Amino acid sequence: MPPAGELRHQSPSKEKLSSVTQSDEAEAASAAISAAAADAEAAGLWTQIKAEARRDAEAEPALASYLYSTILSHSSLERSISFHLGNKLCSSTLLSTLLYDLFLNTFSSDPSLRNATVADLRAARVRDPACISFSHCLLNYKGFLAIQAHRVSHKLWTQSRKPLALALHSRISDVFAVDIHPAAKIGKGILLDHATGVVVGETAVIGNNVSILHHVTLGGTGKACGDRHPKIGDGCLIGAGATILGNVKIGAGAKVGAGSVVLIDVPCRGTAVGNPARLVGGKEKPTIHDEECPGESMDHTSFISEWSDYII
């Protein structure tokens, strides 16, 4: 027995230490498997993109030099998109070589950015009938390009390199007509369809597998400071010209109709339409079925035909 008042020190048992070690090893192994799978997916997609570029170069010789410089001369997706964005966003005083190094270093230092790019490419190819190939999206879809450039500006913002992040944000807005504040948080599997006129405020958050049409504003009310912009859940669909203002929550799998002005929370799998927006359906008559993901199905009008009380 230890003397009264003396604290008794107990060392962790060998069984507990062994359990912790095994748990850590299992997590490390799982992470390694996930990373290897992501690398393999990116490599497979890059092989397909290069095959598409070779096919297009043969079919249209006028594009051969362009396709070689943007895709075929590069060894990876990260290098290709860094080169392409550098040339798209450069100016007489912001050189393409500087931007290329900036983009490539950022993408190379954070594999999650590359993985998000892969998810965004697949989102455009699957959801947009006008997207004829992955290479077409990579080179020509300004919504896709704006998101990839934003991912880099956001990374710079989180590293307290705010002047550079804001300079890049300005170029993105000038070139692509897409205004996303560098502090805004955006998930993966995002489709900005047409993209012109999209505005996303500083404290906005967009989840995964979200589709947003042109002229959408995720803004503030003008009456609040701090956390003042919308939070968009996973799998949402935001129709063309919709305006969502204030620190409101659009629940996972929700839908906002085209031209709506939303000032209220929208529940998960709910639908908001009109100006000012109101909810269609409700808990007793949900407008979105459990098996549907609006951000992926891209069905903009189902709520109109299904609900006779629709008013806009």
Curated annotation (Swiss-Prot):
Induction: By cadmium (Cd). Not induced under sulfur-deficient conditions.
Pathway in which the depicted protein is active: Amino-acid biosynthesis; L-cysteine biosynthesis; L-cysteine from L-serine: step 1/2
Key word DNA damage present: no
InterPro entries: Hexapep, Hexapep_transf_CS, LbH_SAT, Ser_AcTrfase_N, Ser_AcTrfase_N_sf, Ser_O-AcTrfase, Serine_acetyltransferase, Trimer_LpxA-like_sf
SUPFAM superfamilies per UniProt: Trimeric LpxA-like enzymes (SSF51161)
Keyword Acyltransferase attributed: yes
Main location: cytoplasm
Activity regulation remarks: Feedback inhibitions by L-Ser and acetyl-CoA.
UniProt keyword annotations, A-Z: Acyltransferase, Amino-acid biosynthesis, Cytoplasm, Transferase
GO biological process: cysteine biosynthetic process from serine
Tissue: Mostly expressed in stems, flowers and siliques. Localized in vascular tissues, particularly in phloem.
NCBIfam families per UniProt: cysE, EPS_EpsC
Assembly, per entry: Homomultimer.
Stated name of the protein: Serine acetyltransferase 5
Organism for this UniProt entry: Arabidopsis thaliana (Mouse-ear cress)
Gene label: SAT5
